[in-house]
């Protein structure tokens, strides 16, 4: 008697098309034949997971995914000590390859995502993972995976929290600029300073509607932020000419619904803040 895996490929494709994301992942773990068949399927033949938000965190010697389908439906997958926990089940993989398991799962999750995400969030904490994998290798592996995915991730908001600027470009360049509306960049300890001139050259930056930077920005060319309808930037210093430019910019740009540049002047424990509102008033 023929086994289910010996059924015609067209029949198996129809079966998988009727399953949801979790059911296909479960089927993928049944045997090597199912895993290979599902992994080789064209993305268009996989069901849409329809996630609203995907959150990837490397923190406290572990990696975790937060998958939000709706406000009332939330799934968490965690990886630590060489094991993966998902839907009440734990699998053991060994310390040496748990990072590879997590990245491979992230690739599978993104393959299932057909609709545009509301938010894609990454947090890269300064920790060392089990098996000797340093935290800076996590965004590198993610970047390699996104390149292998061979299509940009569609999300309206991209949020990256890190104390190392390198993951920002490694992730940003693989986000679909046509879908991206808001870029949120922040430091986990509030102390990071970063040069953003390279980010400003990307299509993602140029086509986004809003930018919010929760760290001190260096080498800022004010012309690179004039197209944003919502902008929050922290600077260490600013010239009188630049303040005058900011004052006039909202008046010149018709779609400038809100614009805010924060200037933090540190004098001991004292902070002074300047803002430019949508009416060009400083």
What label would you give each PLM region?
Residues 1-282:
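Non-core capping and flanking segments associated with repeat-based/extracellular domains
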């Amino acid at each position: 008697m023929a086994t289910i895996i010996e059924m015609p490929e067209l029949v198996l494709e129809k079966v998988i098309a009727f399953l949801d994301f979790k059911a296909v992942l479960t089927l993928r773990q049944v045997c090597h034949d199912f895993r290979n068949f599902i992994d080789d399927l064209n993305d268009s033949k996989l069901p849409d997971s329809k996630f609203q938000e995907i959150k990837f965190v490397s923190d406290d010697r572990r990696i975790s995914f937060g998958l939000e389908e709706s406000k009332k439906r939330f799934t968490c997958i965690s990886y630590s000590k060489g094991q993966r926990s998902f839907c009440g089940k734990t699998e053991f993989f060994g310390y040496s390859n748990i990072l590879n398991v997590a990245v491979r799962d992230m690739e599978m999750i993104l393959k299932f995502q057909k609709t545009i995400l509301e938010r894609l969030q990454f947090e890269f904490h300064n920790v060392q993972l089990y098996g000797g994998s340093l935290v800076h290798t996590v965004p590198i592996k993610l970047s390699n995976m996104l390149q292998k995915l061979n299509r940009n991730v569609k999300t309206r908001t991209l949020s990256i929290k890190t104390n190392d600027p390198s993951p920002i470009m490694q992730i940003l360049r693989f986000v679909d600029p046509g879908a991206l509306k808001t870029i949120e960049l922040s430091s986990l300890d509030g102390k990071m300073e970063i040069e953003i001139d390279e980010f400003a050259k990307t299509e993602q930056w140029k086509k986004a509607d809003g930018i919010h930077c929760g760290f001190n920005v260096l080498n800022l060319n004010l012309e690179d932020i004039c197209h944003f309808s919502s902008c929050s930037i922290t600077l260490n210093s600013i010239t009188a000419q630049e303040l005058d430019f900011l004052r006039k910019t909202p008046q010149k740009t018709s779609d400038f619904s809100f614009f805010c540049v924060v200037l933090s002047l540190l004098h001991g424990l004292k902070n002074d803040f300047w803002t430019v509102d949508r009416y060009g008033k400083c």
